[in-house]
Amino acid sequence: MPHSSTNIPLLDGYTVDEKFLTKEMLKLTDWYTDDLFHSDEDEMIKADFSRIFCDPERFTDDSQEVMAQYGMGVLYERSDEGEVIRSVTLALRERVLNDYYWQHHNKFSVAVNQQLDLFGKALIIDCHSYPSNPLKRDLDKNSKRPDFNIGTDSFHTPQYLIDLSVSFFENAGYTLGVDWPYKGSIVPLEHYGKNKNVMTIMLEINRALYLNEPTNEKSERYLEVKNITGEYIKLIKSSL
């Protein structure tokens, strides 16, 4: 769960007040994904800091990160609307990356390697949610968004997982986007493009299903969405 936290552990560099940051977090946080995807049977890796402090699913090299051009690379310097929110010095960047970004990725890599040692394979479920209306900086501006979205990797996502996902959500009565409106799924760099025993699939949930948007108040369908998410996780695990 890379984007479920609202914790900002270090305020250095921010040029906006707490009220502004709270408003931005309301928009950008993947609300309650740590609960919606919770499983006592699996290893849960949760970033304990907000994405507007450090986004663990961005590349650290801005030349490789498409969102860096909008000031929303690994360390957000602009809001979704484009306002300047933080001034990041080289020293601050190094501190945040070393103390937070790489610490998170080290935990992630250790968890994946433990699964490989125990079972010879590992399945990563990259857990997210998204607003029903595109964000200002979203690359996909199509306003007609599906209920759920899976993201895939051409090397690390087996076709059978894609097919299973499509049939599951169709049979359950939900719409599903494949690599739409968001694409890709995370893999530790040490295994990326090298080890097919490390499998990955991203699942994104449309927040309109479980929140009373634009608030972060849980809707009456929250438990329904949590249950269907749990069923999906059990299904793809059983297919391994």
Language-model region placement:
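N-terminal catalytic or cofactor-binding beta/alpha core of small enzyme domains
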Residues: 1-124, 129-240
